[in-house]
Amino acid sequence: MSQQYEKKVERTEVVYGGDRRVEGSASASAEKTTNYTHTEIRAPMVNPLPPIISTGAAGLAQEIVGEGFTASATRISGAAATTQVLESQASREQAFKDQEKYSREQAAIARAHDKDLEKKTEEYRKTAEAEAEKIRKELEKQHARDVEFRKDLVESAIDRQKREVDLEAKYAKKELEHERELAMNALEQSKMATNVQVQMDTAAGTTVSGGTTVSEHTEVHDGKEKKSLGEKIKSLF
């Protein structure tokens, strides 16, 4: 029994495409991708027969199903192309302008930084000079205070020496006065003894008297070593 088959072809195609250009570059690329699905189906053609009563398994159902069907499906993808494009004059000019603009902006940033650095340096210099001037004035004041302090020390030492000299001279004068009084007392005592003796002699006239002449001498010792005024003044220096 010959069978006839019906062939059906289904094709689905999807196309992706795009064009990309790099700014400032000397090349451009274009890419196109095509995907499609191809399906072939062969199914047996059914020729309905007149109704036949049959008890077997063969029949219309076997013709439809029993022989089965054949199908093939294939998915194909791919195809990409890259095209090199030369840089145009406008693109080169734009790239040159961008490079010049970049150089100008970079130089402006450097100038701004140098100006800011110069300003901060000047402010720091002024502050440092002001602080140095303040310190210098304080040092000058301190030096003046040191000079006055040393002057006061010298004057105080000189005043002390002067007062000590005056004190020594005062007590040396008192010592001299005391020694003078002692000497005068001794002389008075010696003179009285001589006068008694003379008066005894005058009582006899030319007659040898049997009287005795008594001479008295008084020495006073106070137990201290005596120094002259000159030696005392020299000892102060």
Swiss-Prot record:
Skewed-composition ranges (Basic and acidic residues): 111-125, 216-237
Coiled-coil residues: 115-193
GO BP terms, alphabetized: response to desiccation
Keyword line: Coiled coil, Cytoplasm, Repeat, Stress response
Disruption outcome: Affects slightly survival under dry conditions but does not affect survival under frozen conditions.
Induction and repression of expression: Expression is highly induced during desiccation.
GO cellular component labels: cytoplasm
Region feature CAHS motif 2, mapped onto this chain: 161-179
Source organism superkingdom: Eukaryota
Signal sequence segment: none
Subcellular location field: Cytoplasm
Chief place where the protein resides: cytoplasm
Region (CAHS motif 1): 124-142
Biased composition (Low complexity): 204-215
Region entry Disordered, spans: 96-125, 204-237
Family statement drawn from the similarity comment of this UniProt entry: Belongs to the Cytosolic-abundant heat soluble protein (CAHS) family.
Domain comment, as recorded: CAHS proteins contain 2 repeats of 19-mer peptides designated as CAHS-motifs that comprise each two octapeptides connected by a tripeptide.
Record's miscellaneous remark: Trehalose, a disaccharide essential for several organisms to survive drying, is detected at low levels or not at all in some tardigrade species, indicating that tardigrades possess potentially novel mechanisms for surviving desiccation involving tardigrade-specific intrinsically disordered proteins (TDPs).
Function: CAHS proteins are cytosolic heat soluble proteins that seem to contribute to the anhydrobiosis in tardigrades, but their specific mechanisms are yet to be identified. It is possible that protection during anhydrobiosis might occur via the stabilization of vitrifying small molecules such as sugars, but not via the direct glass transition of CAHS proteins themselves.
Protein's recorded name: Cytosolic-abundant heat soluble protein 86272
